[in-house]
Design a protein with these regions (language model features):
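Noncatalytic, beta-rich nucleic-acid-contacting surfaces in large DNA/RNA-processing enzymes
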Residues: 1-217
Length: 217
């Protein structure tokens, strides 16, 4: 919408009662779309276009080959034909939530796929007949080869930073919400209380610069 950044539009929509959902490989394609909810209302699902660096062509392949859904990130390679680099972008964008994978779990899983691919290529190049009579597909082979690990849970601050780095917005929290308690004890004021202050009262405001207007006015 021209001058307005996606973060501003999403924030305004949520302030007006619109349920906004995260981009997910099992629910959306390139563009944002309305998604029916169990309560009969419509939610706004953000499109994969919101993920920094993701190509429209890859988003279209993911949507076209989704069918009944993806159950594991590797299926986006075997069915949609996307590259490992695309899986990494999707993992960083936290787009595997429908698979019950957090951002860290998804990235760990994708790196496991990358390592399995490298090992397979190395074995083939060595001339060993390891796969010559093996009827198992690559996807079946790797489905049981990933180690089970317990990854540390990211803090809400880390999640918000990662969201802004990949999506340029966050549905989990607002950066200033994490600082509000520290700021409230100083001269910084919330916009919601400005109308109650006496005329001429000195105040400090804290906020995010989403768009730099050029030339400035």
């Amino acid at each position: 919408m021209g001058f307005y950044a996606p973060a501003q539009i999403v924030r305004d929509a949520r302030d007006h009662g619109v349920n906004v959902l995260h981009p997910d490989v099992n629910y959306i394609g390139w563009d944002c779309d309305l998604e029916p909810q169990s309560n009969g209302e419509l939610a706004l699902r953000l499109g994969l276009r919101q993920i920094k660096g993701l190509r429209q062509q890859d988003a279209m392949l993911i949507e076209q080959n989704r069918k009944s859904g993806y159950s594991h990130p590797r299926e986006l390679i075997s069915r949609a034909g996307v590259q490992l680099s695309t899986l990494e972008l999707l993992a960083r964008g936290d787009a595997f939530q429908s698979m019950e994978l957090s951002r860290r779990q998804a990235f760990w899983t994708v790196r496991g796929i990358a390592n399995s691919t490298f090992d397979s290529l190395t074995e083939k190049d060595s001339g060993l007949p390891l796969f010559s009579n093996n009827k198992e597909s690559y996807s079946n082979k790797t489905s049981h080869s990933e180690p089970k690990v317990s990854l540390p849970i990211a803090s809400i601050g880390e999640e918000v930073i990662d969201d802004y780095n990949t999506l340029k917005l966050s549905l989990k929290s607002h950066p200033l919400a994490l600082l509000r308690e520290d700021l409230s004890g100083s001269s910084y004021k919330a916009i919601s209380i400005l109308e109650n202050l006496a005329d001429g009262s000195p105040v400090l405001l804290a906020g995010l610069v989403l768009v730099r207007q050029r030339p400035s006015t």
